[in-house]
Amino acid sequence: MRTKLDGRIRTQIENGVASGHRSMFAVVGDKARDQVPILYHILSKSTVSARPNVLWCYKKELSFSTHRAKKAKKMKKATTTISGSLPDADPFDVFISSTQIRYCYYNETEKILGNTFGVLVLQDFEAMTPNLLARTIETIEGGGMVILLMQSVRSLRQLYTISMDVHNRYRTEAHNEITARFNERFILSLASCSSVLVLDDQLRVLPISSHIENVEAIPASQKKIQSESDAELASLKEAMKETKPIGPLLSRARTACQAKALLRFLDVITEKQSNVTCSLTAGRGRGKSAAVGLSLAGAIAFGYTNIFVTSPSPENLKTLFEFVVKGFDALDYQEHTDYELIQSANPEFKNCLVRINVFREHKQTIQYISPTDVQKLGQCELIVIDEAAAIPLPLVKELISGPYISFLSSTINGYEGTGRSLSLKLLQQLRQQSAGGEAKEGKSASNKGKTLHEMHMEESIRYKPGDKIEKWLNRLLCLDATNCQLKLECGTPPPAACELYIVNRDTLFSFHDASEAFLQQVMAIFVSAHYKNSPNDLQMLSDAPAHNLFVLMAPIDKSRKTIPEVLAVVQVCLEGRLDSDNIQNGLESGKRAAGDLLPWTVSQQFMDKQFGTLCGGRIVRVAVHPDYQSMGYGGRAVQLIEQYYLGLATSLDEEEKAPAPPSKTVIKQVKDGHTVELLEERIEPRADLPPLLQRLDERKPERLDYLGVSFGLTVPLLKFWKRNEFVPVYIRQNSNDITGEHTCIILKGLEHGGSDSDEEPSATWLPVYWREFRRRIVNLLSFDFSSFPAQMALSLLQLKNKHVEKQMKRLVIERSELAIHLSNTDLRRMSQYGRNMVDSHIITDILPIVAKLNFEQRLPQELKLAVTQSAILLARGLQHKHFEDISKELDLPMNQIFALLTKAIRRIGDWFDEVCETAVRENLDKEAEASAANKPTSSLPKAVPLANLEDELESAAKEIRARHDRDRKALLAELGNELQKYEIIQDEKELAEAYESVNMKYANKLVSVKSKRTAIQAAIPDAKDPANKNAKKKKRFSSGGRR
């Protein structure tokens, strides 16, 4: 039975083709698939170009055969019957066999990036996610259409409660009731767009689309009106028409934004300065890859020899290489004659282009490389990084650090969750380097001071400006949050005066005008303050039962009737309360359920199944308004959340309120017996909604045992959380593929009832976790964490939680344990180095041991080192960095590095010596006591000292002095008899006579005086006596005989 088609459908499609805008049709019913050929036929008749190609996305099964050969054979077999008549072929089979259709699984839609289609068909509504919507709809060109196939329902309100596949990820053991707020908002949004028609499976317009009761066709006169952008593009092409090779390349540009970007690229190429970086950012489908591809063709024309292109996958470079070839066509290059195309032999890349060899004038190459192949850029002259936001930031920094021109292109708006990292981190560092400043991290001598050219493209390449589907999608998924006005009029109130409110998610996602404005403001703060965002986060925030949203606001002026201004937004997820048996089974099997990130991770790392039974709150993100960052508002929000879950925010003036049940959306269930026909149903936002904001003292909180955070480890974030007394317990050894950061988990125990209460969660498990974490980090700093800045590593090992510090006992090392780590020779080497008697390489092997003992707090508190000394000891002893690297990192000269290390080693070495001396003294005392105890007992009384030590020493000194006097006198007496024989015995009278008889002027200073010898002198024989001489001679001859 044939029915007349609603004229609004045809008019809608024709208007889209005429204006270059897209149309969308949501078809509800079991036979919705059969209406696709009809809509496609209308579109193909309305266009003057070739039949549009189709992208058909589905979950698992298509429910029909896609084999074109079998379809053609079946149709040929059925063309004739026995009677010879020609039956009517199935329109759907004709459509499948005669149309260029690309079938794609939902989980493989990333492979369609950069492609353009005329028609999009989305089936399996329950498997769709916000990411899929944004990713697929943006591939449709202007004049095309999106067909959304929905299952048969009695009422559109049944779609509110439909179970989506993604909801399985949101369910946890403690929170398993899902409220599909996103579906309700999605259905309501369809009625807000004039380019969306909701139809049944007979192509009848449903009342939800009553806002477009009369669709007027676009007059022919308006179709020929040229926009300002088109006029600007035409003038640019005309101005550069005679300039080669720029003119022919510019003729391929489709928009004015693309033409300006291409001109900037070509200007940089013609200047041939190797210290230039160009950044091109835009939303999805703005023609970035096309502009880069045309610029590469221009680089070949200007004589560049070695050009490299990189991307997360070669499949993403299809459009880029396509426009390189189009650029060659514009420059009259002939394939096989002037250049050749090389496809990849890797089956994973599916015959993608990976190389273009040009040999028109000399050998030139455009080569694809993997982002990890930085070592292949030795002879590079120009490198292009397409979709740079999807490549880890450390790799991007390394790729652009060489002495060559760098082109970056990336999508910063749209569905990509990583696009903001390019603008928030990398481009900020490049701006600092371009301005002559030094980047905070990732500083390199080769890219320091590079000139940066930033370009941004606004106009879409696939459709004309003013596309209503784009506006609808941006509003639904908050994709244009970066363009939201964030200027606040509340000034800068003191953080202590600000208040925290909990947001009612039923009202927030109700699609009311006021709540939509508030939602856009919240998402704008999320996007501008946090670099990792995606539309899927929006669905998680709306539907996940364990998530709560808090906003920090300035004191509200009740006289104003505007939307409250938000200073900070905090998203909290409740986790834990797991069954211990489930945890044990998960730990043994290595599998875990979705959700509950902190309980599962901590339980697995510490092999503690009891931790998962606790109830905790994970702070998913803290986002502060970009104009109010680093002013204390983020810390104030965290402080208020802690007080809220401790029960300190509850009003004392009111009676105790019952615990607030989880927020639920009240949706009227539509049963078969009480259904409303689709053609009579009108869908509108609900009116019976609670207030959007609720004070904390109006809602009794859940009882939590801890608060936790999982974040990408950076120095500023670590300082922020430690300032709020959070304790790190886990760091992932593998870095994040996108940001290059290591995931860190930090916890803070909530002590209900104060420190005197018997319930002190942090008193039982958190100190144990911290001690174990500290021990692991000390050992891992020489492995996966050796690249950490010394400042970050030192901050990880410093505890700032007062409750945990009170329970931490410092286990000072003893002599017996010290001997296991350090020998006596090691201690002597330390002592010598501390006194500058040996070089530093003498103690290189000792530094890891000393550093480990220091940072594991095995040394006494009074031996605490200065911060700089600790950083040097950590960097050298634990991370094994070279002194040159330490000097650059700490910005200290080498002599100060050595001096500070020497002082630290001397202090520690002196304490080690003191420990050894004390141990020796104690051993001697013990031996003396043991020897005294082992002596046999006697009848004599026990000896008692008669005097103290000083008296004994004085007595001994007197005895020694007396002995010395006695020995001296004996020596003088012995020598005196021998010396008397040389004594001159004369009186003064004889001497005076001698002096008078001699003239002293001419004397030779000798005076002779006659004297008489004493008896002793007479006994001595005179050697001059002849008798004595003869006696000596006789004695000689008698002994020797004659000769």
From Swiss-Prot:
GO molecular function: 18S rRNA cytidine N-acetyltransferase activity; ATP binding; tRNA binding; tRNA N4-acetyltransferase activity
GO cellular component, one term: nucleolus
Catalytic activities: a cytidine in 18S rRNA + acetyl-CoA + ATP + H2O = an N(4)-acetylcytidine in 18S rRNA + ADP + phosphate + CoA + H(+); a cytidine in tRNA + acetyl-CoA + ATP + H2O = an N(4)-acetylcytidine in tRNA + ADP + phosphate + CoA + H(+)
InterPro entries assigned to the protein according to its UniProt record, in alphabetical order: GNAT_dom (IPR000182), NAT10 (IPR033688), NAT10/TcmA_helicase (IPR007807), P-loop_NTPase (IPR027417), TmcA/NAT10/Kre33 (IPR032672), TmcA_N (IPR013562), tRNA_bind_dom (IPR027992)
Keywords in alphabetical order: Acyltransferase, ATP-binding, Nucleotide-binding, Nucleus, rRNA processing, Transferase, tRNA processing
SS bonds (residue pairs): none
Superkingdom: Eukaryota
A single BP term in Gene Ontology: rRNA acetylation involved in maturation of SSU-rRNA
Binding site for ATP: G285, R286, G287, K288, S289, A290, A291, V292, G293, L294, R462
Enzyme class: transferase
Positions of the UniProt region annotated as Disordered: 1020-1043
CDD domains: NAT_SF
Extent of the signal sequence: none
Annotated function: RNA cytidine acetyltransferase with specificity toward both 18S rRNA and tRNAs. Catalyzes the formation of N(4)-acetylcytidine (ac4C) in 18S rRNA. Required for early nucleolar cleavages of precursor rRNA at sites A0, A1 and A2 during 18S rRNA synthesis. Catalyzes the formation of ac4C in serine and leucine tRNAs. Requires a tRNA-binding adapter protein for full tRNA acetyltransferase activity but not for 18S rRNA acetylation. Part of the small subunit (SSU) processome, first precursor of the small eukaryotic ribosomal subunit.
Subunit field text: Part of the small subunit (SSU) processome, composed of more than 70 proteins and the RNA chaperone small nucleolar RNA (snoRNA) U3.
HAMAP family the UniProt entry points to: RNA_acetyltr_Nat10
Annotated protein name in UniProt: RNA cytidine acetyltransferase
Originating species: Caenorhabditis elegans
Source lineage: Eukaryota, Metazoa, Ecdysozoa, Nematoda, Chromadorea
